[in-house]
Amino acid sequence: MQNRPLTIGLVAGETSGDILGAGLIRALKAQIPDARFVGVAGPLMQAEGCETWYEMEELAVMGVVEVLERLPRLLKIRKDLTRRFSDLAPDVFVGIDAPDFNITLEGRLKQRGIRTIHYVSPSVWAWRQKRVFKIGKATDLVLAFLPFEKAFYDRFNVPCRFIGHTMADAMPLQPDKLAARAKLGIAADARCLALLPGSRGAEVEMLSADFLKTAQLLRTRYPELELVVPLVNAKRREQFERIKAEVAPELRVHLLNGQGREAMIASDAALLASGTAALECMLAKCPMVVGYRMKPFTFWIAQRLVKTPYVSLPNLLAGREIVTELLQHDCVPDKLAASVMPLLEDSPQTDELKQTFLTLHQSIRCGADEQAAQAVLELAKA
């Protein structure tokens, strides 16, 4: 055992985890070139040299029905991984995101004396806060993207390290707006608004009509307003086009396949659903309004479960409302348009907002891959 190379177990459950895992492996190999990586890996992690025992897609299930259908298989995989990692006894096991799968696995491995890390904090600070106790028992360390996440874990004496956000590392502090416009075919002097009604089908269904009606109202004020709508895949594009044909068939918009980041950088303002898109928009230095609606019963439940004063990451990072959030009954075209309109004007307020975005960007731009690798190595030597 003493002569073997540093051995790291990893399990990633979806594409975002594969990206994080690949970055972590790269950073570890830069320090320990002969380290061995094994577990459940996507194509990017495999390209960096990680052996995989199962295809990552086996773990990538979404929605209650799909999870229930696949549950016997998922439980079988987790049992087998527990056995394999117990036999292998890696120096450290890193569960990358996929908390419903990984945290239980981490707990079982920790009971067997294997050091465990959970990479990417679940949103325990926002809802189902009691999960923090399970996480504390299951892991030796949580790696958190955001400083308020570490502050939350500190309250419960759960070891946590703030490593910064990989997206903040990937995006420049000063984005090139003119280059983004040239790429998307938008004139340098045009006034431009990005509409981002979400990446999930339910979000696109709930928000697209009101976002389009908002754009119509703004067009009466700014007749030459350019509208760009990046959609994550062909399914969401088809869905959006159907809604647009019903709600605003005459409205002129540029539909984009993906290219959400370019659209944000190119635009003067954005109207978007909450989620990671709001963080990305902040990093793009694009002033935004967050609009979000759920089914009434879901919203009723969320109001009782969610423990944070804001829903968008820019506001949570700032600790105050720097971005307008219009939720549920407030997410209507006249209110959305009234909030977006000032952002389309050059003003000291929008300049100040962009400066705040820059300050927040710098606060979470810490070299996350390298920080994560350092945490793994320190735990391996502990």
From Swiss-Prot:
One of its GO terms (biological process) is lipid A biosynthetic process. Pfam families: LpxB. Belongs to the LpxB family. It catalyses: 2-N,3-O-bis[(3R)-3-hydroxytetradecanoyl]-alpha-D-glucosaminyl 1-phosphate + UDP-2-N,3-O-bis[(3R)-3-hydroxytetradecanoyl]-alpha-D-glucosamine = lipid A disaccharide (E. coli) + UDP + H(+); a lipid X + a UDP-2-N,3-O-bis[(3R)-3-hydroxyacyl]-alpha-D-glucosamine = a lipid A disaccharide + UDP + H(+). Pathway: Glycolipid biosynthesis; lipid IV(A) biosynthesis; lipid IV(A) from (3R)-3-hydroxytetradecanoyl-[acyl-carrier-protein] and UDP-N-acetyl-alpha-D-glucosamine: step 5/6. Its EC number is 2.4.1.182. Keywords: Glycosyltransferase, Lipid A biosynthesis, Lipid biosynthesis, Lipid metabolism, Transferase. Transmembrane segments: none annotated. NCBIfam families: lpxB. One of its GO terms (cellular component) is membrane. This is Lipid-A-disaccharide synthase. One of its GO terms (molecular function) is phospholipid binding. The keyword Lipid metabolism applies. Condensation of UDP-2,3-diacylglucosamine and 2,3-diacylglucosamine-1-phosphate to form lipid A disaccharide, a precursor of lipid A, a phosphorylated glycolipid that anchors the lipopolysaccharide to the outer membrane of the cell. It comes from the Bacteria. Coiled coil: none annotated.
